Amino acid sequence: EAGTVVRRNEIFARLGGDEFAILLPGVQANEAEILAERVVRAVAQIPFRFEGRNLRLTASLGVAYLPDHAADADELVAKADIAMYQAKEAGKSTWRVYRADSEANAMTMERLTWNNRISHALENDLLRLHFQGIYHVAGRRMAHCEALVRMVDERNPGQLIMPAHFIPVAEKTGRVVEIDRWVIGEVVRRLARSAEGPAIAVNISARSLGDATLSQYIADTLKQHRVPPDRLIVELTETAAVADLHDAQRLIGTLSQIGCRVCLDDFGTGFSSFAYLKHLRADTIKIDGLFIRDLHLDADNQVFVRAIANVAKGLGKTVVAEYVENEKTLKMLDAFGVNLVQGYLLDVPSVVYPPCAGG
């Protein structure tokens, strides 16, 4: 809908998730501001009905000018991003032109610093993989393991930076697509070097869902290293899959044709959950740790986890529970019919592949 107010010489593009950008070449400031107002109004007029209720959509829009606010394209996007957050602070359905005296400014400049560090890490081989096992509840035998990415911290020699610090920035800037491909390539090489090792699961970002060449890259990499496709498991989050349902269905379909297994990660945190299971034909669902951490103490979570296990069993899917940290939770998951478990009770992430139980 917002794209309908854009003229032919203007570029309307999706940045990812629910974020879009419009590039206006050779316009005056007042023209950009008029367009911003039109976009905000157009979004507000979109009819949207969910579960029998009429909902009102809102948009926050930020405006930045070149060269007034930035020296290059990356900085221009960053300044427009700051202005968008300034608009959010002002209320719903509004827009703002970038101003330098904002707390959001400092936040975004920090994001730019992280983006530079991510670029440096990709260019200088400063990413590392750790592995954590995923085990059968019965007998605690390893079924497969998950690859977890870390970044070398050059400011603190010997230390690694956890993904929570850099992945959100990488998702925002799009560099996460390169990280995803690095992880896939490195995992396939590890699998090739250890023919008897267990399958490895890799996480795919929401950004990579829209990459139409990703499945071919996976197929080519597996073929190049002569690794059977069923040794690679691809995980994508429920929230990302539902937000980009068409792309998720396409990716799951092509991965299944290749022979890779697919896992729907962080299940239960999205707004759809059960309703979309039939549309997203993943082999496995991984229940979000939010529902598992205090499972033995939370009766509501127990009902939810049991229901997931029952529905998954009926659909022929495997269920994984993450963040399993005590015996009481493990026994409860066993009673609920959960197939596989992951967590510190069984092992901790390690550079060793395959990881060792209790390691």
Question: Locations of the language-model features?
Answer:
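Heptad-repeat coiled-coil signal-transmission/dimerization helices
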Residues: 2, 36, 77, 218, ...
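Bacterial c-di-GMP phosphodiesterase EAL domain
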Residues: 103-104, 110-227, 237-240, 253-254, ...
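A short pre-motif secondary-structure segment
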Residues: 4-5, 10-14, 55
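Short beta-strand edge/capping elements of PAS-family sensory modules
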Residues: 74-75, 93, 143-146, 179, ...
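Cyclic nucleotide signaling catalytic output domains
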Residues: 12, 23, 38-42, 49, ...
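EAL-family c-di-GMP phosphodiesterase catalytic domain
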Residues: 23-26, 53, 67, 137, ...
